[in-house]
Design a protein with these regions (language model features):
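Alpha/beta enzyme core
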Residues: 2-269
Length: 269
């Protein structure tokens, strides 16, 4: 892998059978640590609205907010390829609006690639973006914006395709091929079952990665950075396995800090 990850390098990884490792990052320190660890992809997600800002769904995240977050992650990376989500709105409005928004995220935000949520619903926008020179990371399946729009809980257990019937898998394969033909350089296969995931990977030449619900046959995985390190209050009582429980460590640190302040001791750091 070169010093700076490129789309071509990620596509070569698929051909070589090497898994792509990515994280969803929203701030400079986390992006910098993940980059130093050697992640291939830093994905700037509109999931920041739900996981960091307390919104009920990602539809409330604005273009200006995504630009700020994209800049923060870009400043934290030197090696990883940076992908940034188009927030809800531009793609739904028109291909022209999508191109303008993507241009801002690339020119001003420093994104290397633009992710389009529910891309299979907007093939004209995907084609227009590609023709305008925008590298498109096309997300399909049960995507966060689609789930929020229709009031569907966003988890693999609640996906209508989680058990991946043959009919569902066939439809998803058709969508994957359509997105590849539209010019997408990578696919984000989301929450739609391992059977369909395996079929999609075989059906297209471009990398197919996913967060959960896609099975081990995907060309790579992308994980929320804050989930990987257990960095949220929900991890205080959670028995879900993470690589480290930062929430419990932070609780202990803040408790010790408060005790030192109360006792008049010199605080650390």
């Amino acid at each position: 892998m070169p010093d700076k990850v490129t789309i071509a390098a990620l596509q070569q990884m698929k051909r070589d059978g090497q898994k792509i490792a990515g994280v969803v990052a929203w701030d400079t320190p986390i992006a910098k640590i993940a980059d130093l660890a050697g992640v291939d992809l830093a994905s700037v997600g509109d999931s920041v609205g739900v996981n960091l800002w307390g919104h009920d769904d990602p539809l409330q995240v604005t273009m200006d907010e995504m630009l700020i977050v994209c800049k923060a992650v870009r400043r934290g990376t030197t090696r990883a390829l940076v992908s940034c989500d188009l927030p809800y709105g531009p793609v739904q409005h028109s291909p022209k609006a999508a191109i303008a928004a993507a241009g801002r995220l690339m020119k001003d935000g420093g994104a290397d690639m633009i992710k389009v949520d529910a891309a299979a619903d907007f093939p004209d926008a995907v084609r227009a973006l590609v023709e305008a020179g925008v590298p498109v990371f096309a997300q399909f399946g049960l995507t966060p914006q689609t789930a929020a729009k229709h009031g569907i809980p966003y988890s693999s257990q609640n996906s209508p395709n989680a058990q991946a019937t043959a009919e569902a898998a066939e439809k998803l394969v058709e969508e994957a091929r359509m997105l590849e033909q539209a010019g997408a350089c990578m696919l984000d296969f989301t929450n739609s079952g391992p059977v369909a995931g395996a079929a999609v990977v075989k059906a297209v030449k471009i990398p197919v990665i996913g967060g959960f619900g896609g099975g081990p046959w995907l060309d790579g995985r992308v994980r929320l950075a804050h989930t990987a390190i257990g960095y949220a209050d929900k991890w205080l009582d959670s028995k879900t396995d993470t690589y480290v429980n930062t929430a419990k460590a932070a609780l202990g640190a803040f408790t010790a800090l408060i005790a030192d302040v109360r006792a008049g001791k010199q605080i650390k750091g």
